[in-house]
């Protein structure tokens, strides 16, 4: 099936792995919420791959996409610049005065997941140290890697892409949100057969192995 005709809107955290799975489509990466808004406004996308399930489910409820399918999972991790100027060694250090915390905005999947983690850890007050609310996870990654923030929450898969520039601090399993990625074919697509074939490809062993190699978790 020829996939070069496809335009795929995908979560920023899929920037590296999707072209490795299939380099032929045209990809547009960004915050899942912003991409969904573009589809609602009539942008010519064939597929939406979101870093959560709620955004595509909302589009499905509105009749804009076919039934979303879960295709992978992820986890959150805290990153700090390699030099760690704020001397952050635990997530609990984020509540200290003067810490510059960079996060994604509410409504962006990783931003919502970040707030769940902080709440689960009893660290809602750390949000007082937020210096910027970004539009997607790659913006958080860049700010911390460049030393413009003392810490930020990203997906574990994103942290792997800037090894050597950041250090990571794990988050205990009990505080982790359920991070599931769902993909859906846009009903107005002019390439429905190719779009459905791409979704099928994501579920097959070769694509799943590439997702695992990039640090993503099995879909079930």
Residue positions per predicted region:
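Exported/periplasmic ABC-transporter solute-binding proteins
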Residues: 1-28, 33-44, 50-63, 67-220
């Amino acid at each position: 099936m020829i996939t070069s005709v496809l335009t795929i809107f995908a979560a920023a955290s899929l920037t590296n792995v999707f072209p490795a799975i299939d380099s032929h489509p045209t990809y547009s990466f960004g915050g899942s919420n912003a991409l969904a808004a573009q589809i609602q406004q009539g942008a010519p996308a064939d597929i939406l791959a979101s870093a959560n399930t709620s955004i595509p489910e909302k589009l499905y409820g509105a009749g804009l996409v076919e039934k979303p399918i879960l295709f992978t999972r992820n986890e959150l991790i805290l990153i700090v610049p390699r030099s760690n100027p704020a001397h952050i060694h635990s997530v609990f250090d984020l509540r200290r005065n003067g810490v510059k915390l960079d996060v994604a905005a509410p409504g962006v999947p990783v931003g919502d997941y970040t707030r769940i983690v902080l709440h689960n850890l009893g660290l809602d007050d750390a949000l007082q140290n937020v210096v910027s609310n970004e539009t997607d996870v790659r913006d958080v990654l860049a700010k911390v890697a460049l030393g413009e923030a003392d810490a930020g929450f990203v997906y574990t898969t994103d942290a792997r892409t800037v090894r050597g520039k950041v250090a990571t601090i794990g988050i205990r399993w009990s505080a982790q949100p359920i991070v599931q990625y769902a993909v859906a074919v846009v009903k107005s697509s002019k390439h429905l057969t190719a779009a459905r074939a791409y979704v099928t490809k994501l579920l097959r062993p070769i694509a799943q192995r590439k997702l695992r190699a990039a640090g993503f978790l099995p879909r079930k």
